[in-house]
C-alpha cells in the first residue's frame, strides 16, 4: 500500500467558543453533517465538539489536497466513534467521489485534545 497524503491540524478551542457566541448555530451548520448536528445538540462541550470535528476534517482535506471550502467539504465528511471508541470517517457526496477517484483504501485518523487545543492527523493510503 502507498501513502496518498498526510494531513495535520491544530485548533484553538477558545476560537470556536467565540464563534458560537458570535454566530450561534450558523457555525455548526457549516462544519457538521446532519448526523453530527444531532449529536452536537446533545453535547455539553459544544466548542470542544466543533474544534475536534473541524481539526479532523481539516487534516483529511490536507491529506487529500483539497480546500475545506470546496463543494461543502466539511458537511460531506462525517466523523463518529465506533464501539471501540476509535474515530471513523464516512464520506458523503462530492468527497466520496474524490476519495474513489484518488483510490483511497484506508484512512488512519488520530485526535487528541487539551483544555486549549485539539490536534489531529490523517493518513490516507491506496
UniProtKB/Swiss-Prot annotation:
Its EC number is 2.7.8.7. Its cofactor is Mg(2+). It comes from the Bacteria. Its main location: cytoplasm. Keywords: Cytoplasm, Fatty acid biosynthesis, Fatty acid metabolism, Lipid biosynthesis, Lipid metabolism, Magnesium, Metal-binding, Transferase. The keyword S-adenosyl-L-methionine does not apply. It catalyses: apo-[ACP] + CoA = holo-[ACP] + adenosine 3',5'-bisphosphate + H(+). HAMAP family: AcpS. Belongs to the P-Pant transferase superfamily. AcpS family. Transfers the 4'-phosphopantetheine moiety from coenzyme A to a Ser of acyl-carrier-protein. This is Holo-[acyl-carrier-protein] synthase. The gene is acpS.
